[in-house]
Amino acid sequence: MSTETLTLIKNSIKSIPDYPKAGIMFRDVTSLMEDPKAYQATIQSLVEKYKQGGFTKIVGTEARGFLFGAPLALELGVGFVPVRKPGKLPRPTIAQTYDLEYGTDTLEIHTDAIVEGDKVLVVDDLLATGGTIEATVKLIRQLGGEVEHAAFVINLPEIGGETRLEGLGLNVYSICEFAGH
């Protein structure tokens, strides 16, 4: 990816101070999607990175993972699988609970969405703690999928999610990084 493309993408992401609470600098990818050139450059950079990966499925985690994972899946000519919060998927599912800063949350995937031997790429908008993606990876592996790669638009390296995911055997890629929380 060229420096010009990276600058376009990074500059299109708005930073919102003290959201959702004081001391947090929220990185808003919806502003990136409002700019068609930046959005297209983001998807194309992921296509270039993963077009030779041999993936059979792209999995996106609710909700912003859908916005990058689905167009990537179309470009790669593979299926897209959403991982959602409980009660949002109509067919039989399996669930994985994970820890949040204050409490827990749960994610679900259709039991027939991943088959034994599927080579899966996980996509989300932002990597912070890695908890959501860890739960997603556990769901995929429980269904027999092979997942060794996770891609993000943004990484917040100071929070430690990349190290956490590498501990699960994942190769982690992010288009850009921002300092802080």
Curated annotation (Swiss-Prot):
Protein name per the record: Adenine phosphoribosyltransferase
NCBIfam families, A to Z: apt (TIGR01090), PRK02304.1-1 (NF002632), PRK02304.1-3 (NF002634), PRK02304.1-5 (NF002636)
Alphabetized InterPro entries for the sequence: Ade_phspho_trans, PRibTrfase_dom, PRTase-like, UPRTase/APRTase
Localization annotation: Cytoplasm
Family classification: Belongs to the purine/pyrimidine phosphoribosyltransferase family.
Single Gene Ontology MF annotation: AMP binding
One cellular component term from this protein's GO annotations in UniProt: cytoplasm
Major subcellular site: cytoplasm
GO annotation terms (biological process): adenine salvage; AMP salvage; purine ribonucleoside salvage
Source organism (scientific name): Aliivibrio fischeri (strain ATCC 700601 / ES114) (Vibrio fischeri)
Keywords noted in UniProt: Cytoplasm, Glycosyltransferase, Purine salvage, Transferase
Protein EC: 2.4.2.7
Subunit structure: Homodimer.
Enzyme class, broadest EC rank: transferase
UniProt pathway annotation: Purine metabolism; AMP biosynthesis via salvage pathway; AMP from adenine: step 1/1
Xref: Pfam families: Pribosyltran (PF00156)
Listed transmembrane segments: none
Reactions catalysed: AMP + diphosphate = 5-phospho-alpha-D-ribose 1-diphosphate + adenine
Entry function: Catalyzes a salvage reaction resulting in the formation of AMP, that is energically less costly than de novo synthesis.
